[in-house]
């Protein structure tokens, strides 16, 4: 696939991460009953709307029908399955723990990606990355052990465990993108992920509880927080290295708690701030050092 100019690819990743970061604050605007008891319904509608958005793009804008989906082959299937895991686990995590805790667990993605890239792509891991892994793990352990037994969201430790599956799936997805970016268009995999996620959630989502206002918010999530930014990330990954994608993706972790604080009054706990500072510091320093070393 044809890569974009480097600066344009960076811009796409910044837009994608910013759109991803609105998930928490928009979710908190749903009716309390939907937040508390409709976690499967929320995931279903969000995934379905994302699939509609991406499918509509291929049918109405590119006018290619379903050919790109078939052309994606096994990499598209792997990527689609990983998108489905991320779509499901992220929203379920938000129903059990805070936005800040969820996003900070997601911030382990770059380090998990480095480990997987080492195993699959034979990419070497510098000593600074091992140091960052240790520091980030310490931050996550601090967040987990200091978390209260119950919060406004419900069960924080369970939520953080569910959230951990997101960076794992993201790492598998990113390595798949890296291996195939020159020959396979994996944008259709976002559509496939939405379809798989919606199909798995439908039996658990019934009977529906969402009111028209909730459906409008869920459409915003599906179209602009999920479908569009995931498509942008796939396109940007054709031109950016894995460290660049991971580093720019951390913008979601920085902005997500800010929107939740400003828009939903969800003030991050002291343990989240302390552990998060350690996690983000380790990740950012590691990724910046990696990028500088790559330019030498």
Predicted feature residues:
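Transmembrane alpha-helices of multi-pass small-molecule transport proteins
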Residues: 35-85, 112, 168-173, 190-207, ...
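Glycine-/small-residue-enriched transmembrane alpha-helix faces in small-molecule transporters
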Residues: 1-44, 81, 89, 138, ...
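Helix-helix packing/entry segments at the starts of transmembrane helices
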Residues: 102-108, 177-196, 226-262
